[in-house]
Curated annotation (Swiss-Prot):
Region: Disordered, residue numbers: 36-56, 149-207, 443-468
Lineage: Eukaryota, Fungi, Dikarya, Ascomycota, Saccharomycotina
Keyword Nucleus: yes
Binding sites annotated in the UniProt record for ATP: 246-253, 574-581
Biological process per Gene Ontology, one example term: ribosome biogenesis
Keywords: ATP-binding, Nucleotide-binding, Nucleus, Phosphoprotein, Repeat, Ribosome biogenesis
Miscellaneous comment: Present with 4490 molecules/cell in log phase SD medium.
A GO MF label: ATP hydrolysis activity
Species, as recorded: Saccharomyces cerevisiae (strain ATCC 204508 / S288c)
Biased amino acid composition, Polar residues: 149-163
Name of protein: Ribosome biogenesis ATPase RIX7
Annotated positions of the Phosphoserine modification: 42
Residue stretches of biased makeup (Basic residues): 176-192
Domain of life: Eukaryota
C-alpha cells in the first residue's frame, strides 16, 4: 500500500497525532485484508498470481479513508490504544471527525487525479449520528430476537437450534470484521537470537601449568564425551557435573573453553546472572530451555560461570523465594540428564565459582556436581610454563629468563601474568615510538616555549632514567612524541621498520612493578621484599625458622624421607620491637612462598559468626595458594585463654582457629607463624604439638647483636656516615641499655634528621620565621645544596641518644626473663646455641 501522507504540520495536539496514526494503521489492515481476499479469488480462478495485473490495478486493492466510517474508527481506536478510554467521549468523537476529514482531504490532493480513485465525495455521517443509528439497530435487533424466541416456544425444536439457524446479517458482519482485523494485523513476533554453540577455537595446548587439572578433566569429561559406549556397556553412569573453584584469574573459564575446543563438541556458555529475570517463572523457564537445548545438541558441555550467583544456600542464604525456585529448578534439570533421557549421549555441566562454600549443599552431592576441582594459585614451576605459553605468539628478541621472571612473580595468577605480558609489550611499543620520533632539543624561543616544555632530550634520558622509579617506566608518552611520530610516518610502517620492534627482557622488568597481583587487591599480601640481609643478629632464631619453615618448603623430599610431612607452626614472642614481624617477612621471602599477613584484631567482627567465617576464609585462601605462610600478628588478641570470664563469641573464635590448625581439613603446605608480646595470655591448646609447637623467645639484643643491627640498618637505608662515627662507642653508651631493634632504627632515623637540621638551619633565625613563610625559608636555605653533602656525624648520634628512650624498661625485661623461665624454654635456648657452635 502506498501510505497516504498527512499534513502533520497543522496538528497541534498529541491526541490529533495519535488519532491520525491509528487511522493510517486501520487503513493498512483494511488494505492487507482486501489484498488477501483478491489473491485468494485470483488463485481460485487462474491458479496463479499475476503480478502485472496487480500493478496495473493497484487501486482495486487499496483501501482509502473515504471508505471508512467514524464509528469504525472510534471502535478501532479504543481497541488498539487503551489510553484513549480515559479521554472524554465527546472530545474523542469530535477529534475523530476532524482528523478523518483532514485525511480525506490529503487523499484527494494526492490521488484525486488518478482514474482509479473515485473523487466523488460522499457525505459522511458524523460519529454521533452513527452511534444513534447503531443504538436503534441494536434495539430493533433485540426486539426481533425476542419475537423469534417466543415464536419457538410452541414448536418442538429447541431454542438453541432456532437461534443457531437464524442468520443475523449484522452479527455475521461483526464476526467477519473481527476475523479480517486479526488476519490483517501484522504481528511482529520477537524471534530469539540463535546463539553460536559451536566449539571454541582454543585448545588445551594453549594452556600452561595446569597439567594435573587437565588430566582430571579429561578423565571425568573427555572419556564420557568421546566414548560413551564404554559407560553404556558397563552400565556405569558418567559424571553429570564438575565444579571448578579457585581464586579469581586462575583460569576456570579458560580451561572450560579449551576443553570444549579440544573435544570438538557443542559448548553452551552461560553467565549465571543472565539467567535471572524480573518476571515470575521466567528464570526457571530459561533454565528448562537451556537444558532442553543441551539435550538436543548432545553430546555437549554446558558451562555456568559464576554459578554461586544463582545457587545460594536455601537455609537462610536465599533472600527471595525466586532464588529458591531457581536452585530447585537447576537441581531437577541436572537430575534429568541421565543417559536414558539423552539417547546415550552425555550432557555434562561445568560450574565455576570463587566461593564454593556459598553454594547450596544439595548441588554439591554425588549425581550432580560429582567432582570438585580446585585451581590453586600457580607455584613457581607452573608460572614458568604459563609465561612460556603466553609468549609463544610474541616477537621476542634474545633469550628471556622466564625462570627468573617466575621467581619474581610470587602470588601471581594466570590473569596477572597475562597483564604482565601485555605491559611488557606496551613498553616495547613505546620504545619504537621514541626511536622513530627522532625529537631533538631546540633552543627555547618566546614563541615556542610552551611546546619546548613538552619535548624530550634523548641525550639525558640515560642519566635521568636511573634516578626514576621503575614503576614509572611505562607512563604515557609525552604528547609531542606521539605527534612527531605521526607527523614523520603518516603511512603504515614497512616490514623492515617493524623488524626493530620486539619484546626484550628489560621490558618485563620495567613492567613488573606496575602489576598488582589479584591477591594483593583483595587484601592478601604476597611475598614481601624483606630478606635475611635486612635482618641483623638473631642468628639462633633464623636457624630455627630455617629448619622449621624455609627448608620444608624448598626441599620437602628431605623431610619426607624421615617421616615429616605435616607442616610446623612457630610462635615468636618477646618484648616489642625485637623483630618478630620482620623475621616472618624474611622467612616468607626466603622460602618464596605466598604470604598472608593477618593482624589479630582485624578478623574480629561484632556480628555472630562473622569472625569464624573470616578465619575459615583465610585458611581457604591459603589452601588455594599452597605453599603459603600465614602470619598472625598480635595473636593474643585473637586466641585468648578460655576460662569462665571469656565471652561465648571469643570462645567460638578460638575453637575455629584450633580446628583449622589441626582438624579434619588438610593443612599440607600451610605454615603458620604467630607473634605476640604476651604468650601467657594465649590459650594453651594453641601451643600443643601439631599447632604452634615451636616457641621462640626473641629477647632484647646484646652488645654484639646491637652492633650488627645498627650496621645493617645504616647499610640497608643508605645512610651517609662520617668517618668519625664509631658504632661501638654508641652501643656501649649506657643509654643504649634495653634498646630493641626498633629503638636502634629510631636512633638512626633521628640522627639523620639532626644532620638535615644542622645542614639547612645553622642559625637560630628559623625560630623567627612565621609559619606561612616556613616553606619559603626552607627552599631558600636549600638552594645549591645536594644530597651528597649531607653526612651524619658522631655528634648527631650523641644528640639523638639524648632524645631516644628505650621502649622496654628494666622492670619489663625482668618480667620477660621470668616468663621465659616459667615456660621452660631456657634449656631449649642452650641446646640451640650448642647446635650453632
Amino acid at each position: 500500500m502506498v501510505k497516504v501522507k498527512s499534513k502533520k504540520n497543522s496538528l497541534t495536539s498529541s491526541l490529533d497525532n495519535k488519532i491520525v496514526d491509528l487511522i493510517y494503521r486501520l487503513l493498512e489492515e483494511k488494505t492487507l485484508d482486501r489484498k488477501r481476499s483478491l489473491r485468494q479469488e485470483s488463485q481460485g480462478e487462474e491458479g496463479e498470481n499475476n503480478e502485472g495485473e496487480e500493478d496495473e490495478d493497484i487501486f482495486e486493492s487499496m483501501f482509502f479513508a473515504k471508505d471508512l466510517t467514524a464509528g469504525e474508527i472510534f471502535t478501532f481506536c479504543l481497541t488498539k490504544d487503551l489510553s484513549l478510554q480515559r479521554v472524554k467521549k465527546v472530545v474523542l468523537q469530535k477529534t475523530i471527525d476532524r482528523m478523518l476529514k483532514d485525511v480525506i482531504e490529503s487523499e484527494l490532493e494526492e490521488f484525486g487525479s488518478y482514474p482509479g480513485y473515485n473523487n466523488e465525495e460522499e457525505e459522511k455521517p458524523s460519529l454521533e449520528e452513527e452511534l444513534a443509528k447503531k443504538n436503534m439497530m441494536i434495539e430493533r435487533d433485540t426486539n426481533e430476537m425476542n419475537k423469534r424466541i417466543t415464536s419457538t416456544w410452541s414448536k418442538s425444536g429447541s431454542v438453541s437450534e432456532s437461534i443457531t439457524e437464524t442468520d443475523d446479517p449484522k452479527t455475521e458482519e461483526v464476526k467477519k470484521s473481527k476475523k479480517r482485523s486479526k488476519e490483517g494485523t501484522c504481528k511482529v513476533k520477537r524471534q530469539k537470537i540463535k546463539e553460536d554453540r559451536s566449539p571454541p577455537n582454543s585448545s588445551l595446548k594453549s594452556l600452561g601449568g595446569m597439567d594435573d587439572v587437565v588430566a582430571q578433566l579429561m578423565e571425568l569429561i573427555g572419556l564420557p564425551i568421546l566414548h560413551p559406549e564404554i559407560f553404556l556397556s558397563t552400565g556405569v553412569e558418567p559424571p553429570r557435573g564438575v565444579l571448578l573453584h579457585g581464586p579469581p584469574g586462575c583460569g576456570k573459564t579458560s580451561i572450560a573453553n579449551a576443553l570444549a575446543g579440544e573435544l570438538q563438541v557443542p559448548f553452551i556458555s552461560i553467565s549465571a546472572p543472565s539467567v535471572v529475570s524480573g518476571m515470575s517463572g521466567e528464570s526457571e523457564k530459561k533454565i528448562r530451555d537451556l537444558f532442553d537445548e543441551a539435550r538436543s545438541l548432545a553430546p555437549c558441555l554446558v558451562f555456568f560461570d559464576e554459578i554461586d550467583a544463582i545457587t545460594p544456600k536455601r537455609d537462610g542464604g536465599a533472600q527471595r523465594e525466586m532464588e529458591r525456585r531457581i536452585v530447585a529448578q537447576l537441581l531437577t534439570s541436572m537430575d534429568e540428564l541421565t543417559m536414558e533421557k539423552t539417547n546415550g549421549k552425555p550432557v555434562i555441566i561445568i560450574g565455576a565459582t570463587n566461593r564454593p562454600d556459598s553454594l547450596d549443599a544439595a548441588l554439591r552431592r554425588a549425581g550432580r556436581f560429582d567432582r570438585e576441582i580446585c585451581l590453586n594459585v600457580p607455584n613457581e614451576v607452573s608460572r614458568l610454563h604459563i609465561l612460556k605459553k603466553m609468549s609463544d605468539n610474541l616477537k621476542i628478541d634474545g633469550a628471556i629468563d622466564f625462570a627468573k621472571l617466575a621467581k619474581l612473580t610470587p602470588g601471581f595468577v594466570g590473569a596477572d601474568l597475562k597483564a604482565l605480558v601485555t605491559a611488557a609489550g606496551t613498553c616495547a611499543i613505546k620504545r619504537i615510538f621514541q626511536t622513530y620520533a627522532n625529537i631533538k632539543s631546540t633552543p627555547t624561543t618566546a614563541t615556542d616555549s610552551s611546546e619546548d616544555n613538552m619535548e624530550i632530550d634523548e641525550t639525558a634520558n640515560g642519566d635521568e632514567s636511573s634516578l626514576k622509579n621503575t614503576a614509572n617506566m611505562i607512563d604515557p608518552l609525552p604528547l609531542s612524541v606521539v605527534q612527531q611520530f605521526i607527523r614523520n610516518y603518516p603511512e603504515p610502517l614497512s616490514g623492515e621498520q617493524l623488524s626493530l620492534l620486539s619484546i626484550k627482557y628489560e621490558d618485563f622488568l620495567k613492567a613488573l612493578p606496575t602489576i598488582q597481583p589479584t591477591a594483593k587487591r583483595e587484601g592478601f599480601a604476597t611475598v614481601p621484599d624483606v630478606t635475611w640481609a635486612n635482618v641483623g643478629a638473631l642468628q639462633r632464631v633464623r636457624l630455627e625458622l630455617n629448619m622449621a619453615i624455609v627448608q620444608p618448603i624448598k626441599r620437602p623430599e628431605l623431610y619426607e624421607k624421615v617421616g615429616i610431612s605435616a607442616p610446623g607452626g612457630v610462635l615468636l614472642w618477646g618484648p616489642p620491637g625485637c623483630g618478630k614481624t620482620l623475621l616472618a617477612k624474611a622467612v616468607a621471602n626466603e622460602s618464596r612462598a605466598n604470604f598472608i599477613s593477618i593482624k589479630g584484631p582485624e578478623l574480629l567482627n561484632k556480628y555472630v559468626g562473622e569472625s569464624e567465617r573470616s578465619i575459615r576464609q583465610v585458611f581457604t585462601r591459603a589452601r588455594a595458594s599452597v605453599p603459603c605462610v600465614i602470619f598472625f600478628d598480635e595473636l593474643d588478641a585473637l586466641v585468648p585463654r578460655r576460662d569462665t570470664s571469656l565471652s561465648e563469641s571469643s570462645s567460638r573464635v578460638v575453637n575455629t582457629l584450633l580446628t583449622e590448625l589441626d582438624g579434619l581439613n588438610d593443612r599440607r603446605g600451610i605454615f603458620v607463624i604467630g607473634a605476640t608480646n604476651r604468650p601467657d595470655m594465649i590459650d594453651p591448646a594453641m601451643l600443643r604439638p601439631g599447632r604452634l609447637d615451636k616457641s621462640l623467645f626473641i629477647e632484647l639484643p646484646n652488645t654484639e647483636e646491637k652492633l650488627d643491627i645498627i650496621k645493617t640498618l645504616t647499610k640497608s637505608h643508605g645512610t651517609p656516615l662520617s668517618s668519625d662515627v664509631d658504632f661501638e662507642e654508641i652501643i656501649r653508651n649506657e643509654k643504649c641499655n634495653n634498646f630493641s631493634g626498633a629503638d636502634l632504627a629510631a636512633l638512626v632515623r633521628e640522627s639523620s634528621v639532626l644532620a638535615l637540621k644542622r645542614k639547612f638551619f645553622q642559625s637560630e633565625e628559623i625560630q623567627s620565621v612565621l609559619d606561612n613563610d616556613l616553606d619559603k625559608e626552607f627552599e631558600d636555605l636549600s638552594v645549591g645544596v645536594s644530597g651528597e653533602e649531607i653526612i651524619v656525624t658522631m655528634s648527631d648520634f650523641r644528640s639523638a641518644l639524648r632524645k631516644i628512650k628505650p621502649s622496654v624498661s628494666d622492670k619489663d625485661r625482668l618480667k620477660y626473663d621470668r616468663l621465659n623461665k616459667k615456660m621452660g624454654l631456657t634449656e631449649e635456648m642452650k641446646d640451640a646455641e650448642e647446635m650453632k657452635q
